[in-house]
Amino acid sequence: MSFPLLNLDTYTTEDIFALPEGRRAELIDGQIYMMAPPNRRHQTIARELFTAIDSYIKSKGGSCEPFFAPFAVFLNQDNKNYVEPDISVICDLGKLDDKGCNGAPDWVIEIVSPSSRRMDYHAKLFKYRTAGVREYWIVDPEKNRILAYNFETEDIGDYTFQDSVKAGIYDDFQIDFSAIAKRLDM
């Protein structure tokens, strides 16, 4: 479940890394949000999306690197914001080190879970936009909806799991969500 720990103090990334092994959390503006383990449907969608993105990048000989959670993103290059997007695509490889990504990924995909709904649609939308993420997709299997925000062009696409969704950071890449829906029996 994604909820802040009640504390008047603010936390830092040091507190995140001090959590017991296996506990996942994100840090937004100094507040810790614990994360529930993802369900099978969530993981199936994440796997299908990652595989499609990774295959595309490799087929084009691209220099961008896709990552799936848990992967550390130090969003504002400070110690008050740490997220683990379901999928991150980083094209500036200078942002990468052994701990993760220092700064905004180019493309972020979040797959909505019941416990992450408010975070994905509101807090993360704002944080990703202001941090410099170029493109943000919110994939919501419960609502059969994909919102694709292209922050560079100020476009928002609203799709279903029967549509193909074009990636804004690539000219010739789209993901067929109907194929993913078939895997999920949607």
PLM regions and their residue ranges:
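Gly/Pro/Ser/Thr-rich low-complexity, intrinsically disordered segments predominantly at protein N-termini
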Residues: 1-186
